[in-house]
């Protein structure tokens, strides 16, 4: 029986553990979480979702307040065409965040940033180009292109001095999506350094329709590996979505030929995660029936989350002036639905109106009200111990990472704090 640590991931000659922690936004995969994994030689993601607002909270900047004030005149406008991000501010926020991160890196591991194309920010190509290049200029170890086909992303970076230096990868959910990306990126003369294949059991946005259950991670990994082999391409493939233990990771690698694993849900409840303790406890207490896939996101992608997510029962006025990360040509499905609801509410009983289909994802993600999780989140109770007061002991991120690497079969090592707690509370719930 093998442990994940007996395998290795080769990224352009650099040998690393075959495990990446996923980039969970907004600021769930915090800098502290990523740095704790990097310090032990691991691979960790941060997320670039809503970085101006993240910087405001971390560094006391005023990017969000400045944008809200500048765009205040359009608050009652039905379409937000003029509510644009200041590209200089976007660049400054990304630079500040990434520079702060990289200044504290040890160099033992690899720090990556997850960049979502679906954050169109009312000027998709301009803002995406700014975000990508600012991250490169600030010294990020690599960029994982997520939530979109990214048909233009390599072209947007090709003039950057670090275009061939930094590690660049992409998340796909089919060989078709990968083929489109490679064809459009070919003129740059650059191949991705790794490919993350995200299956239907992942948390958050899914790269499938509501027929997601018809797909499987092993089948897609094999499909992508065959696609690459047919074209003579040797690019590491990372399997993601639903891999809960080190033993499962080994099984996926051995059965599919994957070169590594990406995991996220177990890191969401780590001590260094940005989620509030109440959300982490909800994850630990979750049952299978609490985990749902819905159309709450205005991006058009299905999302997997806990049904207890506060956002699902809280329709808020669109905050496009302050945020507007999902605006595209001045509109988004939630903004449109809000306008229609307000029109229907004129002279009507609001309580009788149907519930909103979508949510203001910018606001709710920023406030940690969307509790996204993988399909196996109900197993989190296996990974720790519940205290007498009902709260759960949170593992350190490095403990989660090391357990993935070192555990064999179905075993899961308890956090050190949980082991100590059990010595004085042997009856504690696990």
At which residue positions do the language-model features occur?
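Active-site entrance/lid segments in N-terminal catalytic domains of soluble metabolic enzymes
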Residues: 1-231, 402, 406-429
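A structural signal for short, well-ordered beta-strand segments and their strand-loop junctions
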Residues: 45, 144, 238-239, 262
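Residue-level detector of alpha-helix initiation sites
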Residues: 28, 243-244
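Conserved active-site-proximal phosphate/metal-binding subdomains
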Residues: 202-221, 227-238, 244-430
């Amino acid at each position: 029986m093998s442990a994940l640590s007996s395998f290795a991931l080769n990224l352009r000659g650099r040998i690393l553990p075959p495990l990446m922690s996923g980039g969970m936004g907004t600021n769930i995969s915090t800098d502290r979480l990523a740095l704790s994994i990097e310090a032990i030689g691991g691979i960790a993601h941060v997320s670039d979702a809503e970085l101006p607002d993240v910087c405001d909270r971390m560094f006391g900047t005023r990017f969000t307040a400045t944008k809200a004030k500048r765009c205040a005149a359009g608050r009652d406008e039905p379409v937000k065409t003029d509510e644009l991000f200041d590209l200089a501010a976007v660049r400054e926020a990304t630079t500040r965040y990434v520079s702060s991160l990289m200044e504290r890196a040890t160099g033992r591991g690899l720090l990556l940033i997850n960049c979502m194309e679906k954050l169109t920010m009312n000027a998709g190509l301009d803002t995406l180009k700014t975000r990508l290049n600012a991250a490169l200029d600030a010294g990020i170890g690599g960029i994982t292109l997520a939530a979109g086909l990214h048909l233009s992303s390599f072209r947007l970076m090709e003039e950057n001095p670090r275009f061939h230096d930094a590690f660049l990868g992409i998340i796909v959910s089919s060989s078709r999506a990968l083929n489109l990306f490679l064809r459009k990126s070919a003129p740059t003369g650059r191949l991705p350094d790794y490919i993350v294949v995200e299956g239907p059991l992942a948390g958050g946005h899914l790269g499938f329709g509501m027929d997601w259950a018809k797909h499987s991670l092993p089948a897609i990994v094999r499909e992508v590996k065959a696609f690459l082999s047919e074209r003579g391409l040797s690019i590491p493939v990372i399997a993601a979505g639903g891999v809960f233990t080190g033993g499962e990771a080994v099984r996926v690698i051995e059965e599919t030929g994957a070169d590594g694993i990406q995991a996220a849900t177990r890191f969401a409840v780590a001590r260094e995660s940005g989620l509030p303790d109440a959300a982490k406890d909800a994850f630990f207490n979750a049952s299978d029936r609490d985990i749902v896939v819905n159309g709450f996101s205005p991006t058009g992608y299905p999302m997997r989350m806990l049904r207890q997510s506060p956002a699902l029962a809280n329709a808020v006025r669109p905050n496009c002036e302050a945020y507007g990360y999902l605006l595209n040509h001045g509109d988004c499905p939630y903004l449109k639905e809000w306008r229609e609801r307000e029109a229907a509410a004129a002279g009507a009983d609001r309580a009788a109106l149907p519930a909103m289909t979508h949510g203001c994802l910018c606001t709710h993600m920023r406030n940690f009200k969307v509790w996204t999780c993988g399909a196996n989140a109900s197993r989190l109770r296996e990974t720790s111990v519940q205290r007498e007061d009902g709260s759960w002991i949170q593992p350190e991120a490095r403990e989660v990472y090391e357990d993935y690497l070192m555990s064999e079969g179905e075993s899961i090592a308890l956090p050190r704090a949980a082991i100590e707690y059990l010595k004085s509370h042997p009856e504690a719930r696990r």
